[in-house]
Amino acid sequence: MPFFSTRDQNRKVTSSQAIAQGLSDEGGLFVPESFPQVDVKALCGLDYPALAAAVVREYLTDYDPAFLTDATRSTYGAAFGGKAGYLALVEGDTYALELWHGPTCAFKDYALQLMPKLLVEAKKNLGRTEKTLILVATSGDTGKAALDGYHDIPGVEIAVFYPTGGTSEIQRLQMATQEGANVAV
């Protein structure tokens, strides 16, 4: 599926190009050309990794579907304790979607654990071998989730910035103690 820039709808790129580039040349965001129609009934009963694979396959059409299945299965498996996308019964017919079962207990783990795999595959799809630097500015959970997702990913370096006194002490320590040869805080 083509993606276009929010600042130039005439410039279309593949999903691999959008993921590898991050922002468009004009400084815009890449958005999908359309939103696929999905058969919701066909998705019912799927576990979270299979559901995620079914959805991302609709958007990342230049990726190998088998890769996407493997990537979502490995991402949302053990690191999420088997509870990715877990619906907890509150009472009666009321449920709560628990988004804290990822490795950093932040909802951002859902994106930031899968994205590094998608970036590495995008670079492979495009034949790109240069290093990629991910820059993150945060005042909270994003920093730790990004550091955890991208740590020790080949060909990628990540640097996280946060304002002095702008995070809780726990968040600062989570970021400052992140292991990985390619991380900087």
Show where each model-derived region lies:
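PLP-dependent amino-acid enzyme catalytic core
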Residues: 1-185
